[in-house]
């Protein structure tokens, strides 16, 4: 028996920063930002915990479950509200879950790491898991720095995994890291995000294309078999470059960066929930998730969408 995604949800803060807001105090324009990033607006505010709880509630409701039905909570985040306790513990309590809870920090690739790990724990005996990606990068953003201020937003996404599916959820995955790239994107404790955007772009495209090639080979599929691609929403030009290299049309790709910016671990589950709510996913579809982040870390996974026998 495998697992299946039976619920999904997302959350964004109410406050919206548009590109026009940056035009007022930075040497930039809406056209410049859109051409280089694809971003038109981003949401900021709230807490990592609060957004995670909201997204988790939505995912549970979609799955028709209560918090007490959940035996494992995994929260992917690089921006916990406090050093101790883990965000997952407070989310676990707020939602009334049972079993274990832990945080996972793999930066923007964190949700994909967490999904793979939760699926393996279901194989080992967990019946139901709640996997959340939640980040509030605005708290680490210098809004006087044009290079980073325009990029980041706050947000969360969540999925419920349940055991009992006839087929495996995860067909193949690839996880990777390269610590030599750590100086290219980092934030000291209490400091702002520092990044070398040009080099990050180059390495991200290369790492993601290589990772996707590995999961295609392991899953025995090609880009033609993928019904939908949900990439990390860092920069639309990165998404376009990856798609061109793997031979996947943008029409089969989720792009939400224009309205949420880069929400780190929240971006892939947010995009997945957005696609599911829009009716872009059908039973049995092969879905590609892929992302990269500080570390550098990267992760790709091919999953099969649908309940397929889950009661």
Model segments located where?
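Claisen-condensing/thiolase-fold acyl-transfer catalytic domains that form or cleave C-C bonds
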Residues: 49, 53-56, 60, 79-80, ...
